[in-house]
Amino acid sequence: MNQNKPIWVAGLMSGTSLDGVDAACLYTDGVDILGFGSSAYVPYSAKEREVLRSGLGKWPGDTSLHEVGVVVRDLHMQALQNLPTVDLIGFHGQTLSHDPQNGRTHQLGDGAELARLVGTPVIWDFRSEDVAKGGQGAPLAPIYHWALARYAKLLEPIAIVNLGGVGNLTWVDPRLPAENGLLAFDTGPANAPLNDYMIKKLNKSYDEDGNLAAQGVADLNLVARFMRDGYFARPVPKSIDRGDFSYIGSVVESLSNEDAAATLTAIIVAGILQALEHLPQNPKQMWITGGGRKNTELMRLLRSAMPMRVCDIDEMGFDGDMVEAQAFAYLAARVARGFPTSFAKTTGVATPLSGGRMSIAEVF
């Protein structure tokens, strides 16, 4: 693998929504996007999702994590089998716990084992060093968002919002170098509390098209109460763990299912709207990526609330299902070349840092 020339990289991502494994190929030199390749999605079964949920909040060394690790390994292997041969793999793993205030983060998944199994070098453990050096360890996709804006030849700032289990916002000015043209942070909860509620109350994995929320009325007093959570007063950049807002389910417990779904959806929008106060300037466009963009009611509310054009990133010619997986392909290429993956205004790390470690496939 020539690290100074463009290479094909496969990125693997399993997010906090616990939907499944996204896998995508990217042709890149670690600076520019030079081509998009094949992608694959392997959904988790109900049983696999249950196993993964059992690991949430746990840390390395917990003996109950063996079965969780097997699910992570096997499903990622299955995703890779649906892709062509590549030069490098970027493997995020499954976030189980994230506590940057105490210098800890846990992404389950053994990149060294994956490299042995597939015979390809693997970049993994992207977040630990950033957290160890005082950063938040998240979000990491912003540098890829910068590359996307450059690929689209944008000439003015834009906001890219990923709606996974947690919401993340990246403000990008593509006219500037990444270190100066990025600001990123977590906006608050996104799909996770709503999905958890749907599973608990209705035995459904998510609110399809936002149909349940559309039938309800949001309790704006509860939304305002939630927005007084101390997280929203913290300076940016900042990040959260999926479990930090697990109490939301009990907050809406007294509401009907329809009103609870509407309230949980309104909370997502309120977090993003509040996030705009932190931006250097309001962009004219907001691109939405991640699973939340498929929630018709959520997108309707965002378009109504935001003071700029809001669009599904697919409308711009990108695959919104695969942006996160592509991001970890791009990050892997950057790590291989020693380029920084996080910055002061994305994770809060003091100086630009190239996180992640490489495991080389063993040759016998």
Please report, for each region that a protein language model flagged, where it lies by residue.
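A glycine- and small-aliphatic-rich helix-loop capping segment at beta-alpha/alpha-beta transitions
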Residues: C25-D32, N102-E113, W146-R150, D173-G181, ...
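Conserved non-catalytic scaffold segment of RNase H-like nuclease domains
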Residues: G35-V71
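Glycine-rich phosphate-binding/hydrolytic loop that grips phosphoryl groups
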Residues: L18, D314-F364
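Phosphate-binding/catalytic loop of phosphoryl-transfer enzymes
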Residues: N4-W8, P100-T105, T120-K204
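Short beta-strand-loop/turn "lid" adjacent to the catalytic site in phosphate-handling enzymes
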Residues: W59-G111
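Conserved ATP-utilizing enzyme core subdomain
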Residues: P6, G20-L34, S39-Y44, A178-V269, ...
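Glycine-rich phosphate-binding loops at beta-strand->alpha-helix junctions
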Residues: L96, P283-R303
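Phosphate/ATP-binding catalytic cores across multiple sugar-kinase/actin-like superfamilies
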Residues: L75-L83, N257-N282
